[in-house]
A protein has these predicted regions:
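Short cysteine clusters
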Residues: 161
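Cell wall/extracellular polymer interaction/catalysis modules
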Residues: 1-158, 167-181, 185
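A conserved hydrophobic position in a structured secondary element of the catalytic/binding core
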Residues: 164
């Protein structure tokens, strides 16, 4: 199974485009650009890859549409955005078991197969935007739970996601819709 993906973008110019480029000399950090905004971002612990695999810790090199969003109640206050944001509940999980039929899909507890909890003790998923990596065209073992979320202190590496500081996420959110494309170069 090949996990790389060619992206052909024949969309209209009115679609918001975010570009993420590796920061000079830093494998796990990036500069996220949206129009005139240039924001510091965290990447996966293995940097960027063209051949994403489950558990490799890499951020996929791809163009991904922002398809849905979640938020942790109360932590970030009111958020202005063009995305529909659902509040994260205690029973919300994300399946990361490649052999399971619900692979790379949201699921509810109790759930026996390998999964990630969306209610975290840290702030990472205070805002959690699902990017269309391996969702619309799902392939087992090609990576799951590739999100656009809040960064750890010091922009420590993610498990393959793209992450911003809370202030920068709040700054960018008003411009985002379900037509926004995020490109990792």
């Amino acid at each position: 199974v090949t996990c790389s993906r060619k992206t052909t973008d024949k969309s209209h110019s009115k679609i918001a485009r975010i570009v993420v480029r590796r920061a000079p000399g830093k494998v796990t950090q990036a500069i996220l650009q949206y129009g005139p905004l240039r924001l510091r971002a965290a990447l996966g612990r293995s940097g960027i890859t063209s051949c994403k695999r489950e558990g490799d810790g890499a951020t996929p090199r791809a163009t991904m549409r922002l398809i849905s969003a979640y938020r942790r109640g109360g932590r970030m206050g009111a958020l202005a955005t063009g995305l529909t944001m659902r509040r994260i509940r205690n029973d919300m999980l994300w399946c990361d078991a490649p052999a399971h039929p619900a692979y790379n899909r949201p699921v509810r507890a109790p759930f026996a197969a390998s999964h990630e909890k969306l209610t975290r003790d840290d702030r990472l998923y205070d805002v959690c935007i699902v990017m269309d990596w391996n969702i619309t065209e799902r392939r087992r073992g090609c990576g799951s739970a590739i999100f656009f979320h809040i960064a750890r202190e010091g922009y420590a590496p993610t498990e393959g996601c793209v992450a911003l500081s809370p202030a920068d996420m709040r700054r960018l959110l008003p411009y985002l819709t379900d037509r926004t494309l995020l490109t990792v170069l």
